[in-house]
């Protein structure tokens, strides 16, 4: 079948391997993006190329080694699986994937799609919530190649997404007697919201509202937090790791944690949440720390992606 329409799924990216040099190369590209670190280049680049890229890669490499599998990066493996499953569901499209940082590169994959005869491409960033730090870099990269390509900005309000998210939590929540559900989102600097008008915080809050409403949770049964703080700047609060340390002292000994901003396991879920935060919780007197994994290779999530594409198709045609 000659497919003239294409879907390009885009995830953040991952180092080629968990070796220090590959991690350094990845971090240099990621942290060097002016949309990710919004500081004057003359100030930030010497810091990045100085102490950060000398110290952080080795530390990050050790973290990656704890989550690396025989297939390599979990994020890469699950993104490939999501792509293959979506292709199986949408034979009317040529479905491929790319990474914002690292390989396969967005520009390369789009060129390959065009060369194979795909004329109408829709780019779907694998982030339910829009942010200047995640979706916007994809939009900017795509614009440089072809400003007519449509990029879907977010899908946090798609009901099938919040239904699936609630369902993934409900099974564990009902089977165990947890004191609290923690909905932990990747954080961003506060100034990106207050000064740059990033919609991310509002979309995260809306996601939490929709999910806890579906779960029927009372206000005291859940918390909304932000993880992965980097650098001295003030970030969105409360910080997940701070609350995780405080909760046992508030007689909250059994928690279930979920990270709705991630649709596939990666360093932030497998190491930061499931290992690092769990250790902090237990060290401070916590007893049960369970984790709801992202959707990963769930066929039900692939169906959500298909619905997102279909809704976008209708909106574009209208």
Curated annotation (Swiss-Prot):
Catalyzed reaction equations: Fe-coproporphyrin III + 2 H(+) = coproporphyrin III + Fe(2+)
Enzyme class label: lyase
Gene3D superfamilies: 3.40.50.1400
Any one Gene Ontology molecular-function term assigned to this protein's record: ferrochelatase activity
Pathway where this protein functions: Porphyrin-containing compound metabolism; protoheme biosynthesis
Cellular localisation: Cytoplasm
InterPro entries, A to Z: Ferrochelatase (IPR001015), Ferrochelatase_C (IPR033644), Ferrochelatase_N (IPR033659)
Its EC number(s): 4.99.1.9
GO BP annotations listed: heme biosynthetic process
Positions contributing to Fe(2+) binding: 186, 268
UniProt keyword list: Cytoplasm, Heme biosynthesis, Iron, Lyase, Metal-binding, Porphyrin biosynthesis
Cellular component GO terms, alphabetical: cytoplasm
Family that this chain belongs to: Belongs to the ferrochelatase family.
Function: Involved in coproporphyrin-dependent heme b biosynthesis. Catalyzes the insertion of ferrous iron into coproporphyrin III to form Fe-coproporphyrin III.
Full protein name: Coproporphyrin III ferrochelatase
């Amino acid at each position: 079948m000659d497919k003239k329409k294409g879907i390009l799924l885009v995830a953040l990216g991952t180092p080629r391997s968990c070796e220090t040099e590959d991690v350094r190369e990845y971090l240099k590209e990621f942290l060097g993006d002016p949309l990710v670190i919004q500081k004057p280049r003359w100030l930030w680049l010497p810091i990045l190329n100085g102490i950060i890229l000398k110290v952080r890669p080795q530390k990050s490499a050790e973290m990656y080694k704890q989550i690396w599998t025989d297939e390599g990066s979990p994020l890469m493996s699950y993104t490939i699986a999501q792509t293959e499953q979506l292709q199986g569901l949408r034979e009317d499209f040529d479905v491929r994937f790319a990474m914002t940082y690292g390989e396969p590169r967005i520009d390369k994959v789009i060129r390959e799609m065009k060369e194979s005869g795909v004329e109408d491409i829709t780019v779907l960033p694998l982030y339910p919530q829009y942010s200047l730090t995640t979706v916007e870099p994809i939009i900017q990269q795509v614009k440089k190649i072809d400003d007519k390509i449509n990029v879907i900005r977010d899908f946090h309000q798609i009901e099938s997404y919040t239904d699936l998210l609630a369902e993934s939590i409900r099974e564990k929540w009902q089977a165990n007697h947890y004191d609290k559900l923690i909905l932990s989102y990747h954080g961003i600097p506060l100034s990106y919201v207050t000064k740059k008008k990033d919609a991310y915080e509002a979309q995260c809050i809306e996601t939490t509202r929709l999910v806890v409403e579906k779960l029927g949770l009372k206000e005291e049964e859940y918390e909304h937090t932000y993880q992965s703080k980097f650098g001295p700047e003030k970030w969105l609060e409360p910080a997940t790791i701070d609350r995780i340390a405080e909760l046992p002292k508030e007689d909250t000994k059994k928690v279930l944690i979920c990270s709705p901003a991630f649709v596939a396991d990666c360093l932030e879920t497998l190491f930061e949440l499931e290992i690092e935060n769990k250790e902090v919780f237990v060290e401070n007197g916590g007893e049960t720390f369970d984790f709801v994994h992202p959707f990963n290779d769930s066929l039900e999530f692939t169906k959500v992606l298909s619905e997102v594409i279909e809704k976008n198709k209708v909106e574009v045609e209208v």
